[in-house]
Amino acid sequence: MPANFTEGSFDSNGTGQMLDSSPVACTETVTFTEVVEGKEWGSFYYSFKTEQLITLWVLFVFTIVGNSVVLFSTWRRKRKSRMTFFVTQLAITDSFTGLVNILTDIIWRFTGDFMAPDLVCRVVRYLQVVLLYASTYVLVSLSIDRYHAIVYPMKFLQGEKQAKVLIVIAWSLSFLFSIPTLIIFGKRTLSNGEVQCWALWPDDSYWTPYMTIVAFLVYFIPLTIISVMYGIVIRTIWIKSKTYETVISNCSDGKLCSSYNRGLISKAKIKAIKYSIVIILAFICCWSPYFLFDILDNFNLLPDTQERFYASVIIQNLPALNSAINPLIYCVFSSSISFPCGERRSQDSIMTFRERTERHEMQILSKPEFI
């Protein structure tokens, strides 16, 4: 996922007094020479350059290689489920994040200044923000789809186009909400002599409301929707599991049990829900520190110290980590469960109805296309 950069405002002497952040470029935190208690440190682009480049290269390799493996895995499957579709969309978004956000940030670290024309500056910033929104909205779409799969399973089976509609809406909103970036950002020579792709505000007071709106559109509103969706899903699963245990314990008619079992939530769906929740938790862990830091910083609630600058370097890199972690989560959940072939037939003859049902669900679960 894309991360951000931070813009400093200056006093009459050109000394940076404020560090404002904006989630518009992957793992970017820009600050300028700041003086605190007689100590001076320089621009973010020239500070910790080696360490930042090593971190960015590692993130880039893991993001591109990991998501390429995921895309190849989903492409070669004969049976494409709706969950596979969403996994593919998430991998595509993360891959573009690596190419558009992390790679351009690596180039930027090498050059220090922004060397490309103003048009390139605006286009790059626009694409970075599009991916920022898309990464979040794809997760919202996934949560809505899982909600329908568990709470309204019959409508879910009849609505195959819903997944594609959700993704189209997610990307459309991402492109729409990112349009202001084309106007706000441009190539600019800063007071310290650096040439950067920067926000062209009439006044620094515009920065706080802009970042507040972005924070709500990118993080807080989507996170609220996701939390509500999965809260209902977990509650539904818990209720159905309790009902299932009660019915099965009192069930003696095989046909009746079989009929009832068809209305239950399969372990394949349960595993898909677990995968989705872990993906969401990774998103929260990677993005929460950034947005909390960003809000506190924009409302001047953080002290102007060197420690804050060091903290920003670490925190602003966390969102990019999300795109590298997602493929690892997929690999963990897509591991297959094998059964000894020679023992299957003999075991089938002595299995109870419940054991056969559970084993059938495990066989479904072991197939990657059902994840």
Curated annotation (Swiss-Prot):
A GO cellular component term found in this entry reads: plasma membrane
User: Which cysteines link up through disulfide bonds?
Assistant: 121-197
**Membrane-spanning intervals of the chain:** 53-73, 83-103, 124-144, 165-185, 213-233, 276-296, 313-333
Any one Gene Ontology molecular-function term assigned to this protein's record: vasopressin receptor activity
The protein's predominant localisation is membrane
> Which sequence ranges are listed under topological domain Extracellular?
1-52, 104-123, 186-212, 297-312
Kindly give the membrane topology term recorded for this protein: Multi-pass membrane protein
Query: Which residues are reported to be glycosylated?
Result: 4, 13
Q: Which InterPro entries match?
A: GPCR_Rhodpsn, GPCR_Rhodpsn_7TM, NPS_rcpt, Vasoprsn_rcpt
Which SUPFAM superfamilies did the record assign? Family A G protein-coupled receptor-like
Q: Which UniProt keywords apply?
A: Cell membrane, Disulfide bond, G-protein coupled receptor, Glycoprotein, Membrane, Neuropeptide, Receptor, Transducer, Transmembrane, Transmembrane helix
Function, in words:
G-protein coupled receptor for neuropeptide S (NPS). Promotes mobilization of intracellular Ca(2+) stores. Inhibits cell growth in response to NPS binding. Involved in pathogenesis of asthma and other IgE-mediated diseases.
Q: What is this protein called?
A: Neuropeptide S receptor
* Primary gene name: NPSR1
